[in-house]
Amino acid sequence: MTPPTSNSSMVDSLSSWVAESLSSDMRNNYSTSVGKGRAKLACGFYQERWCIDALQKVVSINEILCGMSFIHSEPDSDSSTTSADSNTLSQHVDKTSVPLDTSIVVKRLPEVEQRQWHKTIKPLPATKITIRLVPIGSTRAITPKVLQVSSDQTVAVLMRFIAKKLRISTDSVYMYIHNTFQPTPDERLGDLYDQFRTNQELIFNYCNTVAFG
């Protein structure tokens, strides 16, 4: 570096630039040092060397500050990785199929419950079933005793048929399956046939008075 013709002008210009780049405390120390340096103007090389050292310190401070700014400006790679993992997990959950255990449980249901379960999904087509009518006690027997009816008919239809044959009101007809229990009028004959048939026949016992219970 070629020393300038006037050490005093170089010191003044460098002093003002360096002082603006420093904090207040550093600026006071710097001004004190410059004041001491002015007392040594006879040694121009010393003054020039001191100013160069001061400038190098300022440059070093700026480099440190720039490095800190760069660190804070870097993207958070961990957060982006976590977000990507969350998206992958949600996609995996959405594609999960029904567990195999569920189908195993359905297959192991009792036979009657399996048929009922299949009917709720797709009702079975109506078929012809055999009904045998057996009178109880002194109730008059009707003919025919064996009927072929549709499986989607209800017990109420059969009660009206018996009432017509006996020439009594429907309220006076009491019907039982195998002399055991009395079905409700809205029950389907096909369902009762599937559960209580004997020798491919559903046996109904009937009378015009209460027989049981």
Swiss-Prot record:
UniProt subunit comment: Forms a conjugate with ATG5.
Swiss-Prot/TrEMBL keywords: Autophagy, Isopeptide bond, Membrane, Protein transport, Transport, Ubl conjugation pathway
Family: Belongs to the ATG12 family.
Function description: Ubiquitin-like protein involved in cytoplasm to vacuole transport (Cvt), autophagy vesicles formation, mitophagy, and nucleophagy. Conjugation with ATG5 through a ubiquitin-like conjugating system involving also ATG7 as an E1-like activating enzyme and ATG10 as an E2-like conjugating enzyme, is essential for its function. The ATG12-ATG5 conjugate functions as an E3-like enzyme which is required for lipidation of ATG8 and ATG8 association to the vesicle membranes.
Organismal lineage: Eukaryota, Fungi, Dikarya, Ascomycota, Saccharomycotina
Record InterPro entries: Atg12, Ubiquitin-like_domsf
GO cellular component: Atg12-Atg5-Atg16 complex; autophagosome membrane; phagophore assembly site membrane
Keyword Transport found: yes
Membrane topology annotation: Peripheral membrane protein
Superkingdom of this protein's organism: Eukaryota
Keyword Transport on entry: yes
Location in the cell: Preautophagosomal structure membrane
GO MF annotations, alphabetized: Atg8-family ligase activity
Protein's name according to its UniProt entry: Ubiquitin-like protein ATG12
Cross-link type Glycyl lysine isopeptide (Gly-Lys) (interchain with K-125 in ATG5), residue numbers: 213
